[in-house]
């Protein structure tokens, strides 16, 4: 909004001219979301405590240390969503179609998460909305996003680029839409599965969003994209501001979510954040890179899939003491803080590997 309001004065005012730069607006987005999180966080937590009689339901079969978390409110993802959306609307170019499509997906996935959290806190169990119903809703929203990208964006591409190779890409044709839906829904649920310990998912989400802030900026810049031999995608640079908003809001949320957490992100936050990262990876044509920089989310998801299939195949045996993987290490004697920090380090390693693909070709 500020960009659009100041646009006529960019060439006449040094201050207005600053808003012409995506880098300046992105840095400002981080500061705005951080400030908003600190401002609304305590009030939101108090409101959620009043609203939720029992707080986030705690699994009885989980690590014993988790029983101390009983009564902690959930739906804290509202803080992330409000601050990110406000910052994006304030600082991004509101004539940019990518911004509106991304915001649509972000808010839509947050509504699914909210309904899931609401069902959990009202019924006082951890089941929430049925899995098939949730997947169906996620699939519908992802399909709408793909249709919007297909018919509102100039020259939509169905190419799948393979990282670390200069010219290796595949034209999936209209099958790309199904692949994109898989990426978006998969990312949404992968982040949701990772969000099981205080602060565990928050930092990897921020790192992944930061990675795609850089990717969005590079592919949206003709000079940098040509230099790095990336597919040039005009107008995607504005997504840098949205990604920066997520980074700032996640860091602000971590202030309240660090162990011992005052509030949980809930599905309201995890489903929406994972979904929107999937959407941005599709827009920037870096879907496989999302699987690399978000490698921690992939590992957590694979651990659940392996556990479920092995349990069914062996009629009751388990590969891990508990899935997702972070619970396995808790059951093995690691403290929660050790699991969280070590997983953050692993996430950082994946991010560095993923970003190296931008240059190593």
Swiss-Prot record:
It comes from the Bacteria. It is found in: Cell inner membrane. GO terms for molecular function: metal ion binding; phospho-N-acetylmuramoyl-pentapeptide-transferase activity; UDP-N-acetylmuramoyl-L-alanyl-D-glutamyl-meso-2,6-diaminopimelyl-D-alanyl-D-alanine:undecaprenyl-phosphate transferase activity. The chain crosses the membrane at residues 28-48, 74-94, 99-119, 135-155, 167-187, 203-223, 236-256, 263-283, 288-308, 338-358. GO terms for biological process: cell division; cell wall organization; peptidoglycan biosynthetic process; regulation of cell shape. It catalyses: UDP-N-acetyl-alpha-D-muramoyl-L-alanyl-gamma-D-glutamyl-meso-2,6-diaminopimeloyl-D-alanyl-D-alanine + di-trans,octa-cis-undecaprenyl phosphate = di-trans,octa-cis-undecaprenyl diphospho-N-acetyl-alpha-D-muramoyl-L-alanyl-D-glutamyl-meso-2,6-diaminopimeloyl-D-alanyl-D-alanine + UMP. Its main location: membrane. InterPro entries: Glycosyl_transferase_4, PNAcMuramoyl-5peptid_Trfase, PNAcMuramoyl-5peptid_Trfase_CS. Belongs to the glycosyltransferase 4 family. MraY subfamily. This is Phospho-N-acetylmuramoyl-pentapeptide-transferase. It comes from Rickettsia bellii (strain OSU 85-389).
């Amino acid at each position: 909004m500020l960009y659009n309001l100041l646009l006529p004065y960019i060439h006449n005012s040094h201050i207005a001219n600053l808003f012409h730069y995506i880098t300046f607006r992105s840095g400002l987005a981080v500061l705005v979301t951080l400030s908003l999180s600190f401002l609304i966080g305590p009030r939101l937590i108090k409101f959620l405590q009043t609203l939720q009689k029992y707080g986030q339901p705690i699994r009885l079969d989980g690590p014993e240390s988790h029983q101390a978390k009983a009564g902690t409110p959930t739906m804290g993802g509202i803080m992330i969503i409000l601050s990110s959306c406000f910052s994006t609307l304030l600082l991004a170019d509101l004539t940019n179609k990518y911004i509106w499509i991304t915001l649509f997906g972000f808010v839509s996935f947050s509504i699914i998460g909210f309904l899931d959290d609401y069902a959990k806190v009202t019924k006082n169990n951890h089941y929430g909305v049925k899995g098939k119903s949730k997947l169906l809703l996620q699939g519908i929203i992802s399909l709408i996003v793909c249709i919007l990208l297909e018919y509102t964006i100039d020259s939509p591409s169905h190419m799948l680029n393979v990282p670390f190779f200069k010219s290796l890409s595949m034209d999936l044709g209209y099958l790309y839409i199904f692949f994109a839906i898989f990426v978006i829904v998969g990312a949404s649920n992968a982040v949701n599965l990772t969000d099981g310990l205080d602060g565990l998912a928050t930092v990897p989400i921020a790192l992944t969003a930061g990675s795609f802030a850089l990717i969005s900026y590079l592919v949206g810049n003709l000079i940098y994209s040509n230099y790095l031999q990336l597919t040039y995608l005009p107008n995607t640079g504005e997504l840098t501001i949205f990604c920066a908003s997520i980074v700032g809001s996640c860091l602000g949320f971590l202030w309240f979510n660090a162990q011992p957490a005052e509030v949980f992100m809930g599905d309201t936050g995890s489903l929406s954040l994972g979904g929107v990262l999937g959407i941005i990876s599709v827009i920037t044509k870096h879907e496989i890179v999302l699987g690399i920089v978000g490698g921690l989310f992939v590992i957590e998801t694979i651990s659940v899939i392996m556990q479920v299939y092995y349990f069914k195949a062996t009629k009751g045996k388990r590969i891990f003491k508990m899935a997702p993987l972070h619970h396995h290490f808790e059951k093995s004697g690691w403290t929660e803080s050790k699991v969280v920090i070590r997983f953050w380090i692993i996430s950082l390693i994946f991010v560095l590997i993923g970003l190296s693909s931008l240059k190593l070709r």
